C-alpha cells in the first residue's frame, strides 16, 4: 500500500510531552521519532518531533518523491510537538522532516530520535523497529549486578570500530565479523572491557565519531541496530564488558542535523558566547533547557537499557563545566555568581548521574575530565543545610 495523506487521527498521551518539557522524560525515544503503529486496523508509522519555532513541518521521503507539504504534521500540544501517522509506511523506509522556518526557508532535517540512518553520502533517517532482539546475556547481567563497580578490577581496551582491523580490500569488518575477530584477541590479552570510540551515527567516515548526528542510532557503516545488539551480546557471552564513548558536550553544524533544527537554536545554547566551540567548529548543548535534558538523558539510558551497554565514558566533560573553556577574555560571560563555572552543565551532570546510577547502580559512569573536578561520576547528594 502506498502511503497517503494522513486520514487517521490519534490522541497522543499528554504525559510524555509534559515530562519532556519538565526535563524528566528519561525515555523520550519511546514517544519521539518514528514508530510502527496500527490505527483503525491500518499499519503504518507515527512520527513525532520537537520543533518549537517551526511554522510548518512535513514528512518527506521516497514514498512522496520528497515533496514538501504533501504529508503535513500537526501539533499535538498546540505548542512545539508535532505528529503525523502515515499508513502504509514500513521498516527501513527513508525519511526526513521538511521544516518551514519563521524566516520562510525550508530545511531538511534527519530525525533526532531515529534508530537507524542511511550511510554516507546519504544522511536520511530510516524507520527501524528495535524490539524483538533475543538476548542471551542473562548470566552476564546477573553477575554485573553483584560486582563491585567502584573497586573491582578493570582492564580496558579502547578501540575504534572502523579502523581496529581491516579485511581484504582495506574494508572494515561489520559488527558480526568484528565480534568474531575481537573476542579471541581481548581474551588472550586479558582485558575485561572494550571501550568503543563513538558508535553513535556521525557524518564523516574519516573521523573518530565524536561529531554525533544520531544520538539514538548506532552507525550504519557496520550494520543494523540489531547487528550491534548482537555484537554486544557476543562479547558478554565471552565475559567481556562493553563501554562506549558518549558525547553530550557538543554536536556538529551539519545542516541535516541538530544545528538550528527549526531555523533557530533548539538544542544549542542561543547565547553565542556559550553556544559554540569555535576551535572545534561545533555547537554546545543548552544544558539548562528541559527538553534538551530529556533528550540527552534519554540517549544515555537508551544505550544502557536497549543495547545492554555496561558503561558510558562521557566525553569532553571539562568543556561542559567551564564557561571559559578554550575561550579568550571577552569571548565568554561569567555565571550569575560571577564565576567561570557553567552552573547549568554542573546541574545537568548531577541529574545525569543520579538518573543513570539511580536506575542502574551496577553501570559505569566514566568522565573524561582533565581539571580534577570532584564527584563527576558519582551520585550527587545535596549538602545538609
What residue spans do the PLM features occupy?
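Conserved small/polar residues in nucleotide/adenosyl-binding loops
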Residues: 380-385
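Substrate-binding/active-site clefts of carbohydrate-active enzymes
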Residues: 118, 138-151, 160-341
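Structural beta-strand segments of beta-rich domains
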Residues: 43-47
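Beta-strand signatures of extracellular beta-sandwich domains
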Residues: 58-60
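Short proline/glycine-enriched turn/loop motifs at strand-loop junctions of beta-rich domains
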Residues: 50-56
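The feature marks proteins involved in alpha-glucan
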Residues: 1-42, 74-158, 163-170, 177
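Aromatic-lined carbohydrate-recognition surfaces of secreted/lumenal glycan-active proteins
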Residues: 347-353, 357-373
Amino acid at each position: 500500500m502506498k502511503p497517503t495523506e494522513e486520514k487517521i487521527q490519534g490522541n497522543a498521551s499528554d504525559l510524555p510531552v509534559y515530562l519532556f518539557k519538565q526535563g524528566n522524560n528519561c525515555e523520550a525515544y519511546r514517544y519521539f521519532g518514528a514508530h510502527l503503529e496500527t490505527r483503525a486496523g491500518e499499519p503504518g508509522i507515527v512520527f513525532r518531533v520537537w520543533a518549537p519555532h517551526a511554522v510548518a513541518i512535513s514528512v518527506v521521503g521516497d514514498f512522496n518523491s520528497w515533496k514538501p507539504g504533501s504529508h503535513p504534521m500537526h501539533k499535538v500540544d498546540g505548542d512545539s510537538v508535532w505528529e503525523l501517522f502515515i499508513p502504509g509506511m514500513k521498516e527501513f523506509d527513508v525519511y526526513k522532516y521538511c521544516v518551514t522556518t519563521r524566516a520562510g526557508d525550508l530545511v531538511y532535517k534527519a530525525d533526532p530520535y531515529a534508530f537507524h540512518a542511511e550511510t554516507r553520502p546519504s544522511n536520511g533517517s530510516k524507520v527501524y523497529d528495535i524490539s524483538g532482539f533475543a538476548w542471551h546475556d542473562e548470566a552476564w547481567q546477573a553477575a554485573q549486578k553483584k560486582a563491585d563497580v567502584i573497586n573491582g578490577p578493570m582492564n580496558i581496551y579502547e578501540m575504534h570500530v572502523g579502523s581496529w582491523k581491516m579485511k581484504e580490500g582495506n574494508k572494515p569488518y561489520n559488527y558480526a565479523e568484528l565480534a568474531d575477530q575481537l573476542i579471541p584477541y581481548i581474551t588472550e590479552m586479558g582485558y575485561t572491557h572494550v571501550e568503543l570510540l563513538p558508535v553513535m551515527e556521525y557524518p564523516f567516515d574519516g573521523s573518530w565519531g565524536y561529531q554525533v548526528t544520531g544520538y539514538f542510532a548506532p552507525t550504519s557503516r557496520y550494520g543494523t541496530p540489531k547487528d550491534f545488539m548482537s555484537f554486544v551480546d557476543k562479547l558478554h557471552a565471552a565475559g567481556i564488558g562493553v563501554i562506549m564513548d558518549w558525547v553530550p558536550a557538543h554536536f556538529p553544524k551539519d545542516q541535516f542535523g541538530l544545528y538550528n533544527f527549526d531555523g533557530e537554536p533548539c538544542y544549542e545554547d542561543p547565547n553565542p558566547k556559550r553556544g559554540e566551540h569555535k576551535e572545534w567548529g561545533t555547537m554546545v548543548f543548552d544544558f539548562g533547557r528541559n527538553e534538551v535534558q530529556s533528550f540527552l538523558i534519554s540517549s544515555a539510558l537508551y544505550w544502557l537499557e536497549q543495547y545492554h551497554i555496561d558503561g558510558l565514558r562521557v566525553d569532553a566533560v571539562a568543556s561542559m563545566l567551564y564557561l571559559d573553556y578554550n575561550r579568550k577574555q571577552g569571548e565568554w560571560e561569567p555565571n550569575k555568581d560571577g564565576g567561570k563555572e557553567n552552573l547549568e552543565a554542573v546541574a545537568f551532570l548531577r541529574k545525569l548521574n543520579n538518573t543513570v546510577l539511580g536506575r542502574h547502580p551496577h553501570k559505569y559512569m566514566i568522565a573524561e575530565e582533565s581539571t580534577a573536578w570532584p564527584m563527576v561520576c558519582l551520585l550527587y547528594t545535596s549538602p545538609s543545610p
